[in-house]
């Protein structure tokens, strides 16, 4: 059952300006693994990646309804890519399943996060059959 949906849109150029001005921004927003993936990208793709992760974490905070800082911190949320490029969101000490979509168009990134409460059967199914893709 879906228990939360969050959406966020950010201007990629604005996030790029923040990264250029505030050297600690990336350290405070991204986990070490996310920073590693970000640094593999150059130019426009680097800014898209950082803006996408920032936006996705904001969308997660909207889906939960309690924001960043009170119960969940930036580093508690990690979004890494599968080999095919699909982003996967993992949240420390969070018992619900999360789904994230990140899309870029022009100077904007839009993200959607869905939080789902799984039944016991669904949790067991994921444990034994972790690849739960549509295709």
From Swiss-Prot:
Gene3D superfamilies: 4'-phosphopantetheinyl transferase domain (3.90.470.20). Belongs to the P-Pant transferase superfamily. AcpS family. Keywords: Cytoplasm, Fatty acid biosynthesis, Fatty acid metabolism, Lipid biosynthesis, Lipid metabolism, Magnesium, Metal-binding, Transferase. The keyword Cytoplasm applies. It comes from the Bacteria. This is Holo-[acyl-carrier-protein] synthase. Mg(2+) binds at residues 8, 58. SUPFAM superfamilies: 4'-phosphopantetheinyl transferase. It catalyses: apo-[ACP] + CoA = holo-[ACP] + adenosine 3',5'-bisphosphate + H(+). NCBIfam families: acpS, pantethn_trn.
């Amino acid at each position: 059952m879906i228990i939360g949906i969050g959406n966020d849109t950010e201007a990629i150029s604005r996030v790029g300006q923040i990264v250029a001005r505030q050297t600690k921004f990336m350290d405070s927003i991204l986990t070490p693994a996310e920073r590693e993936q970000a640094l593999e990208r150059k130019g426009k793709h680097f800014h898209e990646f950082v803006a996408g992760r920032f936006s996705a974490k904001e969308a997660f905070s909207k889906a939960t309804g309690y924001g960043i800082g009170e119960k969940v911190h930036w580093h508690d949320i990690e979004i890494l890519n599968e080999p095919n490029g699909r982003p996967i969101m993992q949240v420390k000490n969070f018992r619900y399943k999360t789904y994230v979509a990140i899309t870029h168009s022009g100077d904007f990134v839009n993200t959607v996060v869905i939080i789902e409460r799984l039944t016991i059967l669904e949790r067991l199914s994921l444990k034994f059959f972790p690849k739960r893709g549509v295709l």
